[in-house]
Amino acid sequence: GKLGKIRTVKSWVYLDWKHELPVQPDAPVPEGVDYDFWLGPAPKHPFNINRFHFNFRWYWDYAGGLMTDWGVHLLDYALYGMNQYVPKSVMSTGGKYAFPEDARETPDTQYAIYEFDNIGLIWESTLGIGKGNYGRAHGVAFIGHNGTLVVDRGGWEVIAESPQGQERMEAVPLIEKGGESGLDLHVKNFLQCMKTRETPNASIEIGGHIARVAQLGNIALRTGHKIFWDGDKGEVVGDEKAAQLTRANYRAPWSLPKL
């Protein structure tokens, strides 16, 4: 295409509206909350407001931090644009670099590199600042020989490569999306499909797959290993420590349903 050969895709979120999460003591369960049912298959733990809504996403027992919280949205854009959906390998690093003493378990800063056929996908996420790649708080960039397509929820633009001042293609200034938000459109589509029994634009298969890709980034981070993935078998190759993190580990009496 006009961008030339795509060599790298970047996907990122810089979340400046979330800052340090102060440590809170455990507390009685609020009235009206069935806390045992809320925990579900997760390990038993005293009630703590930090582990409840909204901040449960920063604890490994329930979620995966920004890698899964935002990764399922932005990596989805990236894979769709790449037209490659199954990584061969992934490695990741990161930690609590911005807020080392706060209450979160998941990293406030993380990087992951996914390997595909003749192309790499790079993930970046951090908390407390909002000026990410190309000045955007979130987005996906398809970096080609002639130019870079930058996309986020608000619109898109093309930045031309210009070695020695000679542009390889025509740049495209920011074109704002306009119209309804993507979230509203997804909700409308989902509700419509409940009535028509059609497949939603974001099907359960798509959602499950992109969640798996994001989780692989966290598994690489938590093990400190480069993870190799067999897409046909749906399993980690040659790494039992990593493979254990792909398996359900439910608290009794919960169990993974068998269909």
Locate the predicted segments by residue:
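Contiguous beta-strand/loop segments that form the cofactor/metal-binding neighborhood of enzyme cores
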Residues: K2-E205, A211-L259
